[in-house]
Amino acid sequence: MDQKRLTHLRQLEAESIHIIREVAAEFANPVMMYSIGKDSSVMLHLARKAFYPGTLPFPLLHVDTGWKFREMYEFRDRTAKAYGCELLVHKNPEGVAMGINPFVHGSAKHTDIMKTEGLKQALNKYGFDAAFGGARRDEEKSRAKERIYSFRDRFHRWDPKNQRPELWHNYNGQINKGESIRVFPLSNWTELDIWQYIYLENIEIVPLYLAAERPVLERDGMLMMIDDDRIDLQPGEEIKPRMVRFRTLGCWPLTGAVESNAQTLPEIIEEMLVSTTSERQGRVIDRDQAGSMELKKRQGYF
């Protein structure tokens, strides 16, 4: 990695650490959202650097849908234990009672009940006034126009017309009772930055990001890795072993894999350099309705 690139990554690192420390100093009860993906791994690594040699002054929160990959759950528990982090796990009890299923109820309803409502329940339950998230501006168009400090009203809704200026890295965290801020320390990072930083810092990631032969079903143009037996095959469908990896991770029925032979971090980085598609092209929730992500964020989604 050349010196110019290394300096760029260190600048991003310094900015993110500054934001994390600013939030810890400014807010009474912050929390770090932990979705187990590569961005969460980088954000957690930066937070540990920000307060080293001390422990994190806030807990991790995972809003569980019950449909994550098994390797993600194993990685989550192992990571929290290894770093001595307080891990809070919340699953929407109403969604569980209703038996919400992405295959039966569809991605939009599944996401709304198990993710959006589940997140709002958790934030209300613990009274968090600031929540870190690993979203980046290069991921998706609605995230591209969102500030680092994303103001949410007492119903956790986001109004893109009601955003605060952030001139010269000055952030306005003043809120009224019941309101909160979502904070995105990785806003200015790109997918390539993330992978190069993971390589530079030797950050552990979920093995699903690396190519391997996995059981895959092709449905509606998406390569779905079959992670358990909660699926009914349609006529003519067949599960076949294919060399795939994931660029983004979520609920396994709603997250498409990509065909790839990249089995190491340098190979992933090389793949990123020639990629012309978004990493979220395989996320069903981003295209289940017009303006999908912005609509979800207006309703309280991250």
Swiss-Prot record:
EC number: 2.7.7.4
Protein's job: With CysN forms the ATP sulfurylase (ATPS) that catalyzes the adenylation of sulfate producing adenosine 5'-phosphosulfate (APS) and diphosphate, the first enzymatic step in sulfur assimilation pathway. APS synthesis involves the formation of a high-energy phosphoric-sulfuric acid anhydride bond driven by GTP hydrolysis by CysN coupled to ATP hydrolysis by CysD.
Class of this enzyme: transferase
Protein's name according to its UniProt entry: Sulfate adenylyltransferase subunit 2
GO-annotated molecular function: ATP binding; sulfate adenylyltransferase (ATP) activity
Entry annotated with the keyword Nucleotidyltransferase: yes
Catalytic reactions of this protein: sulfate + ATP + H(+) = adenosine 5'-phosphosulfate + diphosphate
InterPro entries found in the cross-reference section: PAPS_reduct_dom, Rossmann-like_a/b/a_fold, SO4_adenylTrfase_ssu, Sulfate_adenylyltrnsfr_sub2
GO biological process, one term: sulfate assimilation
CDD domains on file: Sulfate_adenylyltransferase_2
Keyword field contains Protease: no
Subunit annotation: Heterodimer composed of CysD, the smaller subunit, and CysN.
Family the entry assigns: Belongs to the PAPS reductase family. CysD subfamily.
Pathway listed: Sulfur metabolism; hydrogen sulfide biosynthesis; sulfite from sulfate: step 1/3
Organism: Cronobacter sakazakii (strain ATCC BAA-894) (Enterobacter sakazakii)
UniProt keyword list: ATP-binding, Nucleotide-binding, Nucleotidyltransferase, Transferase
